[in-house]
Regions:
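Active-site-proximal helices and loops of the catalytic beta/alpha 8
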Residues: 6-27, 42-48, 52-53, 59-79, ...
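Eukaryotic low-complexity intrinsically disordered regions
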Residues: 125, 129-133
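Aromatic- and acidic-residue-enriched carbohydrate-binding clefts of CAZyme catalytic domains
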Residues: 26, 63-99, 132-184
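Boundary/entry segment of secreted carbohydrate-active catalytic domains
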Residues: 16-36, 177-182, 187
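Alpha-helical scaffold elements lining the catalytic groove of polysaccharide deacetylases
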Residues: 185-197
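Short glycine-centered, acidic/aromatic-flanked micro-motifs in structured strand/loop junctions
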Residues: 31-33, 84-86, 213
């Protein structure tokens, strides 16, 4: 009896690290700036059938409408209230999305913008997505309500009121991030307003939260807010389930604030992951894939059960945030597919796949001057629907990386090999590497400038397997390269360095 209660207690304490996805659903996808009605459809027609565990959505709460530049993507990170109306849809559409996605086993993770309100220069008026009045100059947000007493101006010690020195911990947490009005999260009143908002989302059925700008909040303030949260809605989650928490903490190693400061609250975003993986696949600074043998904690990353990992995110794919020019994105599609394949095959961390929109990149002196451009929209500012082409790709400038065969099939690969150990590593000392996941899956990469032809131990049962990168198994038929595994687990692999996708992945569910 005692052991049962102990396990129950541990479960209650550690729930915030558990993604709450269904068993054997091991990844989420960020449908950046998608409309709620498109997400609901995507859950039903694509994400559920292909084993995706959940969706990170753009902030669902009311934001300021910025007209100079014209409705940039970052206006959604400038709250005016916690009402549920944005360019992605209204509260009715939001509730419909959460219900429909949950009903097919795909959960919703909300991007929670709780560190701040809108920018100090956002003016006064009702230019907000629900039409709520606000006055940024006097810090008056009656739709919450917040007033000047609810902000950190008196606590901030920098001259400008903005963060000027990232080596000064209190500045980073008490001053304004790029002039965004910094909420006084030390006040119980403010904590309660935020918790009310998050609890409303929990009641609707969301599964967890990405805590935006967590680095700019004191960990104990975040904890105080999380302590006020309800358990998840028992209609879709086991009784007593805690919301999954992952905190945006950009820690590349050069500052006093560490990702580990936030482990008590939940997982953290491991920004070193994509930055380093990009450097390796681009072969910069003498890096090579052979060095990935001890990938994960061996590279100085946070512990695997505290990490949320990704190749790129909505910030760093356009030069914001962290990682610089090493970050791989859909613009570098060949390397991007390899990076995504490596991430989804490797056991480290909980994986998030990016799904982007195209924008007109324009570089001047190494900076993309169009990095602000918002989602594909109509003349009236409404977001364009995600249309689906005959070949299953998306139209209207939606990139839909999560629908690329190579990435979707690796999401499935990760589900198949879930819980299996990292095994049978091989490398050629350069940029040809391979590894398995127990006796369930095997993957091999050729990122060298010459072809690969080798027989390796796969750890897999004997038989003929269909490569899920160059094609896939459809019924009893393989549209791709076939790999023959002998009775001793050995198989021969041939990958030309000019191949469209210079990697091969096989798993037990792709056995013919």
């Amino acid at each position: 009896m005692g052991v049962y209660f102990l396990l129950l207690f541990v479960g209650l304490c550690w729930g915030q690290y558990n993604p709450n996805t269904l068993p054997k659903r091991t990844s989420i996808v960020h449908l950046f700036e998608w409309r709620w009605q498109d997400i609901a459809q995507e859950c039903e027609r694509y994400l559920a059938p292909n084993g995706f565990g959940g969706v990170q959505i753009s902030p669902p709460n009311e934001n300021v409408i910025i007209t100079d530049p014209q409705q940039p993507w970052w206006e959604r990170y400038q709250p005016v209230s916690y009402k549920l109306c944005t360019r992605s849809g209204n509260e009715t559409e939001f509730r419909d999305m959460v219900t429909r996605c949950n009903n097919v086993g795909v959960h919703i993770y909300v991007d929670a913008v709780i560190n701040h309100m809108c920018g100090a220069n956002a003016g006064a008026g009702d230019h907000a997505t629900c039409g709520s009045y606000f006055n940024a100059k006097t810090e008056d947000f009656p739709a919450v309500p917040y007033s000047g007493w609810d902000f950190n101006d008196h606590k901030c010690k920098s001259k400008s009121g903005n963060i000027e020195d990232y080596h000064d911990i209190s500045q980073v947490r008490d001053c304004r991030l790029v002039s965004l009005l910094d909420l006084a999260l030390g006040k119980d009143y403010v904590r309660s307003r935020i918790a009310e908002y998050l609890n409303r989302l929990i009641d609707i059925g969301v599964a967890g939260f990405r805590i935006d700008a967590a680095k700019h909040m004191w960990p104990e303030d975040v904890k105080a807010i999380l302590d006020k949260l309800k358990d998840l809605n028992a209609r879709w989650f086991p009784a007593g389930t805690k919301p999954f928490i992952y905190q945006e903490v950009i820690d590349l190693g050069g500052e006093p604030i560490k990702g580990s400061d936030y482990f008590g609250n939940g997982r953290v975003t491991e920004f070193k992951y994509g930055a380093k993986l990009g450097t390796v696949l681009r072969k910069w600074n003498g890096e090579k894939m052979a060095y990935l043998k001890n990938w994960g904690e061996g590279w100085g990353f946070v512990p695997t059960d505290r990490a949320l990992v990704f190749v790129d995110n909505h910030d760093n794919q356009r030069g914001h945030g962290a990682g610089g020019s090493s970050i791989l994105t859909f613009w570098d599609s060949r390397l991007y597919k390899m990076a995504s394949g490596f991430m989804l095959a490797h056991p480290y961390g909980f994986t998030r796949v990016m799904s982007s929109f195209r924008w007109p990149r324009y570089f001047e002196n190494g900076k993309d001057i169009n990095d602000w451009v918002g989602p594909p929209s109509n003349a009236d500012g409404s977001i364009k629907p995600v249309t689906i082409n005959e070949d299953t790709t998306c139209g209207n400038d939606w990139v839909c990386e999560h629908r690329w065969r190579q990435i979707k099939n690796m999401v499935i690969f990760r589900n198949v090999v879930d819980g299996e150990p990292f095994s049978n590593w091989w490398d050629n000392g350069s940029n040809q590497v391979a590894f398995g996941r127990g006796n369930k899956g095997f993957i091999i990469f050729n990122n060298d400038d010459w072809s690969l032809n080798i027989s390796l131990q796969t750890g897999l049962p004997a038989g003929t397997y269909c490569d899920v990168i160059s094609g896939q198994k459809e019924g009893d038929f393989c549209t791709a390269v076939e790999v023959h595994v002998a009775t001793d687990g050995m198989a021969n692999f041939l990958i030309g360095n000019e191949d469209k996708d210079p990697f091969i992945a096989i798993h037990v569910d792709a056995k013919l």
